[in-house]
UniProtKB/Swiss-Prot annotation:
Keywords: Cell cycle, Cell division, Chromosome partition, Mitosis, Nucleus, Repeat, TPR repeat
One annotated GO biological process: maintenance of mitotic sister chromatid cohesion
SUBUNIT field: Interacts with Nipped-B to form the cohesin loading complex.
Protein name: MAU2 chromatid cohesion factor homolog
Annotated source species: Drosophila erecta (Fruit fly)
Protein origin, superkingdom: Eukaryota
Function of the molecule: Required for association of the cohesin complex with chromatin during interphase. Plays a role in sister chromatid cohesion and normal progression through prometaphase.
TPR repeats: 453-486, 493-526
Length: 632
């Protein structure tokens, strides 16, 4: 064959490839898309015996189309595996990296474990060292999988490698993304000092080395979210306020109508085409951390208001595109609002919203959300059972929670509630055992003001029940010191009302009144019906002792009102179909029918796909409440 004939044949083949690809794209983008004909066009390419690179790319495109538009996962896998086998040995050919990334996603969808996905990505990371964009993208994807599997050390190491690679390529924006992502992983591991060092380092780079003002503001939001979560994890509700205010201002800037689209900000340079979360999802996340702060500070009305706004925003985004991260946000928000309802005495609403959280978890593919949130659901049902005086059910729920979770704060929270159950049911041996265990495990290692304050509160409650009033005062003053330092209002109100009861028990009516008065003021601001019930009983006794008949009548009337509200709510609880959830101890939670959660929360308003995980989702606001010292 002559050279001219060969050239003519090649040109003719190229024209066929281009025509078939154009036709395939035409069918794909038709309204509605004609995927069958699109696939037939791509399939026809193989009849021309195309060169290796064209063949590999076509197999990749077939895999992409099949994954995106059909349920034929097996055929998609075959095409992607073929694309990988052809492209892997070819140098300077990016198709291998795109294929590896997609194959890893497919393995995660279909396999019971993530071994194959990790192996595929490790090989691709190894091959991509001369391609900074793909090297960093694959490192992020692999670290995400390790983080999802709770292999945090491996995830952290990969993110450190990514930061170095970005630094060597002078990709400052990308380097900061890696640093902040790693800080998030270290936060989950509770490596407090390392988190602080990384945040300080990233903060300085954001302030001094990011020339693009839009990218700078975006990174600032990421940085401030982590900083707020860092302080909240330490229970530092007062300390966090300036950072939270700054975060709220930054997100308003990003959400302004004149702010450029994410595509415009991150589309110019390949090494800047990385986004932690789109701005619409960041907006929801800022609501979420604001809810968490309001709960910990003891502002239930604020927490409810922001939860309603966040859930409305989630429903809007779900109508556009139902991203998995939105379900994660929804579950966390529901976990918060459930605790909020119980503090306010709305337990029937709480069990409805526990059922709503269950439904969101059950709807996620492969029960992935249920696996991650099962322990939290058991804990919430334990709190609900406690509040309805089902102590045996509550105990079993907390025991399941402790056995299922590896999160130290959730374990401590459940154990403190178990301690209160043992206290209320007079099981002194079990109580001593659990308090000793909590003390040994947490006193020197756990640094959350809220939870350690709660631990001292439980010890104070224990001392009070033993009539060791001096010891009770010592523990409760320690609790008050911690609560007042960080404006933990619920912890303060609970400690004050218990201290008031201590002073009443030893006949010191003046000090008792000095404690119960601010306790009731705080409880009405929160509002916390349990502290109000307890405080009104103490006030009734104090006014009776001082022969103040009118105030005694007023206090008694208030006590009756709070009591009747709780009794009426209790009746609604036991009549609710969702009440059956108290009997769920293993496996999938039962399906229960009943009224949905409050419409104002879940109806749309008339109103990752992140590179790294947003798993800093500990349900905060775990503080004591209730006449008998219940925690929420």
């Amino acid at each position: 064959m002559s050279a001219s004939t060969s050239t003519s044949t090649a040109a003719s083949q190229d024209a066929c490839y281009i025509s078939l690809l154009g036709l395939a794209e035409y069918f794909r983008t038709s309204q509605p898309p004609n995927i069958k004909k699109c696939i037939q066009c791509l399939q026809a390419l193989f009849t021309f015996m195309p060169p290796s690179k064209v063949e590999a790319r076509t197999h990749l495109q077939m895999g992409q189309i099949l994954m995106a538009y059909t349920k034929n996962i097996d055929l998609a896998r075959q095409h992607l595996e073929k694309a990988w086998s052809i492209s892997e040995p070819l140098p300077n050919f990016d198709v291998k990296f795109d294929t590896a990334s997609l194959l890893a996603q497919l393995h995660l969808q279909t396999d019971r474990n993530s071994h194959q996905a990790k192996a595929m990505l490790r090989r691709a990371v190894e091959l991509s060292q001369n391609n900074v964009y793909w090297h960093c993208k694959l490192l992020l994807q692999l670290s995400q999988i390790h983080a999802s599997d709770r292999e945090y050390s491996l995830a952290s190491e990969l993110l450190a490698v990514g930061a170095e690679s970005a630094d060597e390529a002078s990709a400052t924006y990308l380097k900061v993304l890696f640093l902040l992502s790693r800080a998030m992983i270290l936060m989950i591991e509770r490596k407090t000092n390392d988190v602080l060092a990384l945040l300080n380092s990233a903060g300085q780079i954001i302030d001094n080395n990011i020339p693009n003002p839009h990218q700078k503001e975006y990174l600032k939001v990421f940085f401030l979210v982590l900083q707020v979560c860092y302080y909240l994890a330490l229970g530092q509700v007062k300390t966090v306020k300036p950072s939270l205010k700054q975060l709220q201002m930054s997100i308003q800037t990003i959400m302004a109508p004149n702010w450029p689209s994410d595509e415009a900000i991150f589309g110019a340079n390949q090494l800047e085409m990385f986004v932690w979360l789109p701005k619409e999802q960041l907006y929801v996340l800022v609501y979420l951390v604001t809810v968490s702060h309001s709960m910990m500070a003891g502002y239930m009305d604020k927490a409810q208001k922001y939860t309603e706004k966040a859930l409305t925003q989630i429903e809007k985004l779900k109508q556009q595109e139902d991203k998995p991260i939105l379900s994660v946000f929804k579950v966390i928000l529901l976990e918060h609002i459930v605790m909020c309802r119980m503090v306010m005495g709305n337990r029937e609403l709480a069990i409805r919203e526990i059922a709503a959280a269950r439904d969101v978890c059950m709807a996620a593919p492969q029960r992935s959300l249920l696996r991650r949130h099962s322990a939290q659901l058991h804990c919430l049902i334990g709190l609900y059972s406690m509040s309805t005086n089902l102590f045996e059910h509550a105990e079993r729920q907390f025991v399941v929670c402790v056995s299922e979770t590896s999160e130290r704060d959730l374990k401590l929270f459940a154990n403190l509630n178990l301690a209160i159950i043992y206290l209320r049911t007079k099981r002194d041996t079990d109580l001593k055992q659990i308090l000793d265990a909590v003390s040994t495990e947490n006193t020197h290692t756990y640094s959350s003001q809220a939870l350690m304050g709660g631990f001292y509160y439980v010890q104070g409650l224990h001392a009070f029940h033993k009539n060791s009033f001096h010891e009770a005062k010592r523990f409760l003053r320690e609790t008050l010191k911690m609560a007042n330092a960080e404006d933990l209002n619920r912890l303060t109100s609970c400690s004050l009302v218990l201290l008031s009861h201590v002073f009443l028990s030893i006949g010191n009516s003046k000090e008792s009144m000095n404690m119960v008065t601010p306790a009731m003021q705080l409880a009405s601001k929160i509002p916390d019906i349990h502290v109000q019930l307890w405080g009104s009983a103490i006030l009734k006794d104090l006014h009776r002792m001082s022969k103040d008949v009118q105030h005694e009548k007023d206090a008694y009337a208030n006590h009756v009102k709070y009591s009747e509200n709780l009794i009426a709510d209790q009746r609604k609880c036991v009549q609710s179909a969702h009440h059956e959830l108290v009997n769920w101890f293993q496996g999938d939670p039962p399906v229960t029918s009943g009224p949905p959660a409050a419409p104002v929360l879940l109806m749309p308003e008339s109103s990752v796909t992140a590179s790294v995980p947003v798993i800093a989702s500990t349900s905060a606001a775990m503080q004591p409440a209730g006449q008998y010292g219940q925690f929420y």
